Amino acid sequence: MNNFGNEEFDCHFLDEGFTAKDILDQKINEVSSSDDKDAFYVADLGDILKKHLRWLKALPRVTPFYAVKCNDSKAIVKTLAATGTGFDCASKTEIQLVQSLGVPPERIIYANPCKQVSQIKYAANNGVQMMTFDSEVELMKVARAHPKAKLVLRIATDDSKAVCRLSVKFGATLRTSRLLLERAKELNIDVVGVSFHVGSGCTDPETFVQAISDARCVFDMGAEVGFSMYLLDIGGGFPGSEDVKLKFEEITGVINPALDKYFPSDSGVRIIAEPGRYYVASAFTLAVNIIAKKIVLKEQTGSDDEDESSEQTFMYYVNDGVYGSFNCILYDHAHVKPLLQKRPKPDEKYYSSSIWGPTCDGLDRIVERCDLPEMHVGDWMLFENMGAYTVAAASTFNGFQRPTIYYVMSGPAWQLMQQFQNPDFPPEVEEQDASTLPVSCAWESGMKRHRAACASASINV
């Protein structure tokens, strides 16, 4: 396990009674009299530990391998490494990051079915053996570059009910799977298991059942060909926040019986998964500052009974956009909703508004329409559930820098992380400590932020 002390974490350790919300307000207050009101994140590492406890309870047979691509922030990876999770890496760079933090190669799966030969060789030279494939060409590459690899066959699934579909790009059909297994046997390459991914934002948990059933078929094919497969990877697609139609426990409530049916506990099959957004989405809150404002007058309709306020809309420009943190709107099908840092007056008027990023691109729009009280340059907007597929894909287009991330952790969360590193960590401690962890940036009832009335839903995770 990775033993490290507070000094190794670039993290603010919260005093008793303080939460991530307090740090966010503190950072805003610190720059209130300055012109440098840059966008920033507050990330609650304790929220990630709470998610891990929740995972252990909901999917006790499934070992999580965190999808590094979702958020490769070093503090996130290090926190999860301390809990003993594995890691789903998609490239040489991600493998380097994870191994630089002391994670052994046995806790890494190179889960990219289409790999560059030089990166396959890098994995071989650094002890990473588990890797996925879905084609004969990939088999040939691995046979030459990493003959001792432990291969996992990625199969296609019905991801028609997912927001982000992956089977259009990855996965072998059942018919092709048999041919690939036979070819792997000819090449003397060891196939140790099967993987699949039902897609992100899956709205039908029965998709998992069908995929697990298909995986069982491929296991049986493997046995007929002569492989003794022992690994099932059920992929990702687990929600990372509560503002979704299908809750995490609703999904796991369907997965567990399917696993027991097709891969019972006495089958000798190890089961892993590749959660990404599940762990990090709700841990991050983004604060952006209004840097410009434009009033747009609507064309007069001639109606006498129209409220004068309805004749204008507001355009707000903030210092992060779709080329930065909000790339999730373009690439992850996210719908974001702002929170107001200042509580509006009860009788304050609301206006039709739109929110735009800082770049020169006319497509840099964050929210097409929402109802907000009139705001001003220098005011702050907050966006919750911004930990997944945001900072990892942010660019510096137009010279706009990525927001700073301020990590926080409570005392109980820190103690829990130390307990995770104890090999004798008892299951009963897990539930006991879950309730002691503080609420993160999903504000407690007495401190709730005022939520703007937007046409779009909260971020889709």
UniProtKB/Swiss-Prot annotation:
What's the PTM story here?
A: S-Nitrosylation inhibits the enzyme. S-Nitrosylated in vitro on 4 cysteine residues.
Q: Which GO terms describe its cellular component?
A: cytoplasm; cytosol
Source species: Homo sapiens
According to UniProt, the name of this protein is Ornithine decarboxylase
Pathway(s) served: Amine and polyamine biosynthesis; putrescine biosynthesis via L-ornithine pathway; putrescine from L-ornithine: step 1/1
The protein's site described by Stacks against the aromatic ring of pyridoxal phosphate and stabilizes reaction intermediates is found at: H197
Activity regulation here?
Inhibited by S-nitrosylation. Inhibited by antizymes (AZs) OAZ1, OAZ2 and OAZ3 in response to polyamine levels. AZs inhibit the assembly of the functional homodimer by binding to ODC monomers. Additionally, OAZ1 targets ODC monomers for ubiquitin-independent proteolytic destruction by the 26S proteasome. Inhibited by 1-amino-oxy-3-aminopropane (APA, an isosteric analog of putrescine). Irreversibly inhibited by alpha-difluoromethylornithine (DFMO).
- Catalysed reaction(s)? L-ornithine + H(+) = putrescine + CO2
Residues at which pyridoxal 5'-phosphate binds? S200, G237, E274, P275, G276, R277, Y389
PTM N6-(pyridoxal phosphate)lysine: list the residues: K69
Q: Which family is annotated?
A: Belongs to the Orn/Lys/Arg decarboxylase class-II family.
State how it assembles.
Homodimer. Only the dimer is catalytically active, as the active sites are constructed of residues from both monomers. Does not form a heterodimer with AZIN2.
Note one Pfam family from the annotation. Orn_Arg_deC_N
Q: What induces it?
A: Down-regulated in response to enterovirus 71 (EV71) infection (at protein level).
Which branch of life, at top level? Eukaryota
Question: Where in this protein does the record say S-nitrosocysteine is found?
Answer: C360
Q: Name one GO biological process term.
A: cell population proliferation
Q: Which residues carry this modification: Phosphoserine?
A: S303
**Chain sites annotated for binding substrate:** Y331, D332, D361
Catalytic residues (UniProt): C360 (proton donor)
State its Enzyme Commission number(s).
4.1.1.17
Required cofactor names: pyridoxal 5'-phosphate
Q: Which UniProt keywords apply?
A: Decarboxylase, Disease variant, Hypotrichosis, Lyase, Phosphoprotein, Polyamine biosynthesis, Pyridoxal phosphate, S-nitrosylation
UniProt GO molecular function:
ornithine decarboxylase activity; protein homodimerization activity
| Top EC group | lyase
Q: Which disease is it linked to?
A: Bachmann-Bupp syndrome: An autosomal dominant disorder characterized by global developmental delay, alopecia, absolute or relative macrocephaly, and facial dysmorphism. Neuroimaging shows white matter abnormalities, prominent Virchow-Robin spaces, periventricular cysts, and abnormalities of the corpus callosum.
